[in-house]
Amino acid sequence: MSDHDPRDLIVIALSGVQRYITESQTTADLRAASQIVAHLASEAVDHLKKDHGAEMVFPSTGVQGGEEAKDGIPNRVVALIPAGQGAIAATAVKKHLKARWKGWVEAVFGEGLETPGWPVIYLASVSFGSRSYAEAWELAQRSLAERKNIRDFSQPGHVSEELCMLSPRWRAVNKENVPSRAPEHWKGEQLAVANWVKRLWGRDADGDQRFPSTNAIASLPYRRAVLTLWENVPGVPELVQRLHDAAMTEPLASDPIKETRTPGLPEQPSGKVPRWLRRRGSRWIYPETWHVDALARECTDSLDEADVLKTDPSFIRTVRSGERAARELMELMVAEGVAPPSPHLAVLAHDVDSMGKYLSGEGEGQDRTRLDLSRGHEEHSKVSARLARTATLQRAAVEDAGGVVIYAGGDDLLALVPAESALEAARACREAGDPGLPHASDGLLFFHHGSSLQRALNSAHELLEEAKEIDGKNGLGVGYIRSSGSNAKCVLPWVGRETQGPSSVQSSPVDSLELFVPSASHPRARLSPRLLSDLLAQRNHLDGGPESATQDQYEVLRYDVARRVMKKLVLRHTSLTPGSGGTNEHSAQNDKAEKEAFAEQVTESLIRMAPKQKLIDENAVRIALFLRQEAR
């Protein structure tokens, strides 16, 4: 576009998107919120093109469309409009989006109810006049920032309803207004209008929008192994049949939650029971699911009814039978070299660093190039195409790792991944980034499938923000939250520093962390949790201890000596699960060599994850131990 092209530049931004998406109770809520945002952005694009003759810049023409666009279109829309029509078109788009949202609300409730503060739509329109595209872009960004600083505290009048359980900034819908189409088991939930639209989105949109649950994603590697060994290991079909029979006995069979098929599971074997394992069987393969008191409460509407059910001999027999089948199946799989089902999965939040500076031509891509906005809007159109290609590659990378994508826009991504392959997915998404775009940072949070999804999402985004605070950004924030509430986190640069010891040239913290994932390295090796306390007990002598310690009180060992001591401690807490080679002398020698090799790699990896001039980072050690125990 020439500097004197007679058109207007408009920028439309949907704000509050991350908040609306993360205020989700289930994975289906999460997916629906993402699709609602994507549909709003898509509506803006369609309206601009059809009603205002717009030339799209973000997303550029030809990059949207198909299934992937439903959750991959960016929440930023940029277009060129005939001169003098920019402000009119921007206002019309805002009105159109508000009307579309109102229509979705009416489809759920049968009437138009207010949703103060959602959706939030910011507009900026700039007439070119004698301005260049670069000048118009800069002015539009300033105008947009100024509009965002003007807070609109739109609130309804005084109402007495309870606060929404997901979004306490809103009041919940009263019982009389709960959508009639809501399933019976949802009608007791205190949800605001906007969250009822989210909850029922899959039932009102075209197609089946159900989404795998957290326990389905966490158990995917184990269920895949069960299905793979189905026809080759005697006992597997019979034990899964017993699991199925127990789970399909009343009142357990009346579970109203319909589980969708988890992507990544083999199509064979066929039949009713394998089909059940691919869908509703995900929660029942965990022995801990089969708890009499918990299931009695789940299957009844009151505590009094639960007290009666948990003393019912028939109910107790059913639960005990299911627990035995799950435990025997786990023991059989372990004997075949398959780890027990992990109760954990991970949230992966990925975001390109300094995207605003890059789009303004002030920041560099990974290839050290900058955008030249003097060439006009084509520079941004090329970026849009790069983002679309990146989103496609990242989606494939997550799916290859057994994960499911919530949204992927090229500059950001949110996904749920099994614990076993979470680090693999994080690295693959990074490698899928276009070299012309800036580096990206990541937040990776491991959590128990029965824990709060909303807390996990918020924690993953907090880790992402912390990763962006390190020097140069380009970081990985990783942490975990156990079902007990215990947690740890650390932030590491993607490109590591050189260490003094013998290095295997591990340049990324993922390389160091991945050593602790059993399926990635030394699957027989185990680390005792007591390693942490021993390392902390010797920390002052190994590296001087934490910064708060009085340095003069301790004699700090020379680096090579400290490293040997550290390796000795690691070796002391390393054990191997039984192998298939028996107990002869040759096997014993092999085991000793494997333990030595594992201890050497663990020592090197822990040092690489420690701050400069230190050998130990307490939280990094905690995460390493967690991965070795739970990322299976």
Residue ranges of each PLM-predicted region?
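Regulatory and interdomain segments flanking nucleotide-handling catalytic cores
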Residues: 1-632
